[in-house]
Design a protein with these regions (language model features):
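N-terminal Sec-pathway targeting helices
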Residues: 2-20
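Surface-exposed, glycine-biased beta-strand/turn segments
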Residues: 30-128, 132-136, 177, 186, ...
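Acidic, glycine-rich catalytic/binding loops that coordinate metals and/or anionic ligands
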Residues: 44-46, 138, 142-145, 158-179, ...
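Soluble periplasmic/extracytoplasmic beta-strand elements of cell-envelope proteins
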Residues: 98, 130, 148, 198-203
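Short glycine/serine/proline-enriched coil/turn segments at secondary-structure junctions
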Residues: 120-122, 139-140, 190-193
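Beta-strand/loop nucleic-acid-binding surfaces
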Residues: 146-155
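Active-site loop architecture of trypsin-fold serine endopeptidases
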Residues: 184-198
């Protein structure tokens, strides 16, 4: 199963703005702050895209260890536009990080392994790989976890940007931290409906049988901040102090 999600950002922004402007509560007062936060995140993303150099402190760099004791490396360059738990459409809670490149072109911004582990690319995965990390002592006290990387393909899904040494059907191939996995793309899972160019990165729990859980369910994931050492600054932006 390809664990990717369509992100129609302009549509989400319009819907959120209309709902907030109309004062619709729908499921109660908790919904409005969540939608408002989504609008703010999209506005910040646009600000960063307009002039990334002016917001260098918002930019993260691949291979960086954000704090000296962070167990994982930052997996790519860019701006963390959406974090775990963020919402940019009704009924949605984001399960990981969306890290957007300023490069302006697909197949340009490298994606690397955040930690040593065993890589799998299922036979039908165009843009995704997942890495198993057994006996992860830091943060989770020896549990097995997985890191998931997706959107590494063209908008129409015909060209994969995953590194050629990881063809479809790859299972349990050891990769050290920092290994090149591929490049950021904009495949959403639906041809003709591209995402912005970015990497979706998440830290996924194991199932009872030892496989990876369904990453699209936020309850099956951990906050990447715990592993990367990312923090929110005073403006609410997810930043990596080591970048």
């Amino acid at each position: 199963m390809q664990l990717v999600k369509s992100r129609r950002y302009r549509v989400y922004l319009l819907i959120a703005a209309l709902l907030i402007g109309a004062g619709l509560l729908l499921t109660g007062v908790a919904l409005r702050p969540r939608l408002a936060a989504g609008v703010e995140q999209i506005a910040r993303l646009r600000t960063w895209f307009a002039n990334p150099a002016a917001r260098g402190d918002w930019t993260v760099l691949a291979g960086t260890r954000c704090t000296p004791d962070a167990p994982m490396l930052m997996p790519t360059d860019g701006y963390i536009g959406f974090g775990r738990g963020d919402s940019f459409r009704l009924g949605h809670r984001h399960s990981g990080y969306d890290i957007f490149t300023s490069a302006g072109a697909v197949n340009t911004t490298p994606v690397i392994a955040a930690y040593d582990g065993y890589l799998t690319r299922e036979a039908d995965w165009r843009s995704s790989v997942i890495i198993r990390h057994p006996d992860f002592q830091r943060v989770v006290g020896g549990e097995q976890i997985w890191t998931y990387y997706t959107h590494m393909a063209s908008a129409d899904g015909t060209q994969s940007f995953i590194a050629p040494q990881f063809p479809p059907g790859t299972h349990e191939l050891f990769v050290p931290a920092g290994t090149l996995l591929g490049y950021q793309g904009n495949w959403s899972g639906t041809a003709g409906n591209p995402t912005g160019i970015h990497l979706h990165f998440s830290v996924v729990k194991s199932t009872l049988s030892g496989g990876y859980a369904n990453e699209t369910d936020i309850d099956n994931t951990y906050d990447p901040a715990l592993f990367l050492g990312v923090t929110r600054n005073a403006s609410g932006v997810l930043v990596c102090e080591g970048s």
